[in-house]
Amino acid sequence: MSQIPSPNDPASTGAAPSSAAVPAGPSATPAPSPTAGFSLPGHRPPPTGKALAALAVGALGVVYGDIGTSPLYSLKECFGGPHGVHPTDANVLGVLSLVFWAMTFVVTFKYMSFVMRADNRGEGGILALMALVGKTETTRLGRRMLLMLGLFGAALLYGDGIITPAISVLGAVEGVAVAAPAMERAVVPATVVILVFLFLFQKQGTAKVGAVFGPVMLVWFATIAVLGVRGILHDPTILRALLPTHGLSFFARNGWHGFLVLGGVVLVITGGEALYADMGHFGKRPIRVAWLGLAMPALLLNYLGQGALLLHDPGAARNPFYLLAPEWALYPTIAIATAAAIVASQALISGAYSLTQQAIQLGYSPRVTIRHTSQREIGQIYLPEVNWMLGTACLALVLGFQTSSRLASAYGIAVTGTMIVTTLLFHRVMRDRWGWARWKAWPLTSLFLTVDASFFLANVVKFRDGGWFPIAAAALVFTLMSTWKRGRDALALMLKDAGLPLDLFMADVARRKVQRVAGTAVFMTSNPGGVPPVLLHHLKHNKVLHERVVLVSILAHEIPFVNEPERVNARELGSGFFQVIAHYGFMETPDVPALLDSLPRRELAGPRITIVPMETTYFLGRETLLANGPSNIPTWRKRLFIVMARNAQTASAFFGLPPNRVVEMGAQIQL
């Protein structure tokens, strides 16, 4: 089991990498794990019957919101975008053929059949995949390359999370301009109002309304399926598009221009990564059932219906989705589309929260405020700082780009870049985790990369049209995450070198007669084998120790969850000292007071430890970092790291420590 430094450190744990925090500060010394490893959580039998149906409907509301709203703008971009083709019969059949085979190959074949098998104890997503393959890499260079690759993929996902709410809501509200052209100027203001309310609502949590997300998307998929069937019945010849020959002849006929149309076709698979990222919430089977049983058939019917409309009326390319609806159903369709767009946006926002939580626990992001909005659902969280950054960026995109067509140019690069990163990491899973031979793994990887790279290159030409935005956003996030990781590792190394081994300290305490005072003192340390500097400072300056001293280490591991029976190890060190080591996965948030309160109820092999809250004082270190130290990090990165450390959430708040029971002791460190 690979242990990673718990994200704690800089401005919050005494001069030592307080592991009790996940970024309690920039340090975090990975100490040898006191346990040999963790058992796999008990596997529940695959859901069946009503349970499977309920999970599948739930998956519709979370997993398929992004890809489910793609019909609002995908074909409009293929035929009416800056690189669109004229909607002749041959081109319509060719584009629809590409749409069908893109959905079949990328979503059904690549993600459903292969990538979803590469789970990190049930969890999926870029960071979970990176943590999974990182366990098998033994060389320093190899781990560094995997880290950089995974962080850039995660950074691209943030760009996706910014664009999706903007383009989905814009695409839905643009139906108003179809119903009443005079209302076109109201599209952007209406979109802004909806997004403002959406982001303001986040602090309330989705526990109360989350139950309706699935039914809303169920109605949405039923609606688009009916609209599609209506279009197909008007011109059934569109079904010829299912033949791959039409896609191939499209490229032969249009050449380079036809290749560029892939930049619009890729919009039909923009939610593919969500299938993998949300795997831990619903499980593989419900996600597959929802896709094959409803989502894919409904999407395919709607795209074919739009294609049939274009065969009959090429002028409908300006907005084929809404023009597919009969006039009397236009406003109800707009309402349902807007509701679906809000659900899709919520799914991406919640995904950004989850991704940030993972990054914090894995040590790639400074601490931010994490609020649990549901007592029953552990995954229901709200991150105020992330929410406001996403909200501000989304509103800026809407005001800057104005239309979903312009935003579509920015969308594809983030999605296709993430797909390439996933393929490269998945190759390592096949080779290192599954033991596939090169002759078996490389052909599949090459096939995936050929398709991914084709979509990516077709979108690169849109760089000046808006593609620069996700690249800029990803570069910014990547710089922040990599800077935090480098700075934290450097600080951890400095603190480790300056630390004192625990066994030597305990031998010294046993020899010396230090004055003791009543009560319990809790010291946080990220290194179970060392003494936290804050304890040394306390002893040096105050020259006393409490009757009972508890050293708490919270270690973050590269697995999503830790089984409760394996959560805690405790032992008595002698002279009134106790050591508590707690283990957490990257999907969990530690609560130190609750952890200590639970000790008497746990069946621990070590001593029975009872903590009286009003007789307990928590000691934390607060480091003041200076950029003039000996580490080989560039000065600009040191300064950026220091700014991030200063603005990180305090360790006491992150660990839920009672403010009136916390004592902080400062130290100056030259980084």
UniProtKB/Swiss-Prot annotation:
It comes from the Bacteria. The chain crosses the membrane at residues 52-72, 92-112, 147-167, 181-201, 209-229, 255-275, 291-311, 323-343, 381-401, 407-427, 441-461, 465-485. Pfam families: K_trans, K_trans_C. Residues 10-37 have a biased composition (Low complexity). One of its GO terms (molecular function) is symporter activity. Residues 1-43 are annotated as: Disordered. Keywords: Cell inner membrane, Cell membrane, Ion transport, Membrane, Potassium, Potassium transport, Symport, Transmembrane, Transmembrane helix, Transport. The keyword Nucleotide-binding does not apply. Belongs to the HAK/KUP transporter (TC 2.A.72) family. This is Probable potassium transport system protein Kup. The gene is kup.
